[in-house]
């Protein structure tokens, strides 16, 4: 007999994270989406994986993820409602063997669907798993100050990254590889998914200009913390600029010393020798 899925750690983690994202104002209305790669062992504790509720076609070749299980936020769902009604706003899905569809095993009880950004998420999972087999989470949100920076700051990866590194001491330690930036593209398309996943091969943070940010990590906490750290730096930058601009900041020599102390190396070419 399977356990009650409402007691599953992965459901509780997702509910808590979506609530925090809404509380912080990073996922207004139905903005934002999360996909959480699950281990089969943890899924079968709560679900009979042979009991398929319905099959949902995809306009994307997901064969590289065939057979894998994911907990996914629903299309058009409000993050503020997840904690009170997980079964309506979330779904546990399995990618079909041919990669052309997903099987719904639990959730979306109002006949809902997975997030419209599923192709971008799945492409990002494929990219991250190719360089980090332990990657489990892809998270998209509209982090306010990072979003604002895309209107006022130079949109080159090196300069954007350097500014974030210089605003908070912990930034270099948390994301030494920097942030990736794609052009503005229509959301919910394979095109934006392909652009994002290409950047995901080298970065865990991808900025969507005038829209939001994508983050990836080994756990829900790691991924949330990654975005949270970059957003804090962007907030500090916003405050600094409103106070008259930068008069002093963390120097490149100090950033190098920081990297040496914490065993991380800044992306090649981003610091001045």
Curated annotation (Swiss-Prot):
Record EC number: 4.1.2.19
Broad class of enzyme this protein falls into: lyase
Active site positions: 117
Pathway(s) per entry: Carbohydrate degradation; L-rhamnose degradation; glycerone phosphate from L-rhamnose: step 3/3
Annotated compartments: Cytoplasm
Cofactor(s) in the UniProt record: Zn(2+)
Pfam families listed in its UniProt record: Aldolase_II (PF00596)
GO biological process, one term: pentose catabolic process
Catalytic activity field: L-rhamnulose 1-phosphate = (S)-lactaldehyde + dihydroxyacetone phosphate
Residue positions binding Zn(2+): 140, 142, 211
Note describing how the cofactor binds: Binds 1 zinc ion per subunit.
Identification of the protein by name: Rhamnulose-1-phosphate aldolase
Record organism: Listeria monocytogenes serotype 4b (strain F2365)
């Amino acid at each position: 007999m399977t356990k009650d899925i409402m007691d599953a750690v992965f459901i509780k983690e997702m509910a808590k994270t979506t609530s925090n994202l809404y509380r912080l104002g990073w996922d207004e209305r139905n903005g934002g989406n999360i996909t959480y790669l699950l281990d089969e062992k943890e899924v079968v504790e709560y679900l009979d994986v042979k009991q398929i509720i319905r099959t949902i076609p995809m306009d994307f070749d997901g064969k590289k993820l065939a057979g894998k299980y994911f907990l996914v936020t629903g299309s058009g769902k409000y993050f503020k409602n997840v904690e009170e009604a997980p079964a309506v706003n979330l779904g546990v899905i399995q990618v079909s063997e041919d990669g052309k569809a997903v099987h719904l095993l639990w959730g979306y009880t109002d006949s809902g669907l997975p997030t419209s950004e599923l192709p971008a998420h799945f492409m990002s999972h494929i990219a991250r798993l190719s360089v980090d087999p332990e990657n489990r989470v892809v998270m998209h949100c509209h982090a306010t100050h990072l979003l604002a920076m895309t209107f006022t700051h130079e949109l080159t990866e090196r300069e954007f990254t350097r500014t974030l590194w210089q605003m908070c001491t912990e930034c270099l330690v948390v994301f030494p590889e920097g942030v990736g930036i794609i052009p503005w593209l229509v959301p919910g398309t394979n095109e934006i998914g392909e652009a994002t996943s290409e950047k995901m091969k080298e970065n865990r943070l991808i900025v969507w200009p005038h829209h939001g940010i994508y983050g990836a990590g080994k756990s829900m906490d790691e991924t949330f913390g990654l975005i949270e750290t970059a957003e804090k730096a962007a907030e500090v930058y916003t405050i600094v600029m409103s106070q008259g601009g930068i008069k002093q900041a963390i120097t490149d020599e100090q950033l190098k010393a920081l990297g040496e102390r914490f065993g991380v190396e800044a992306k090649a070419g981003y610091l001045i020798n």
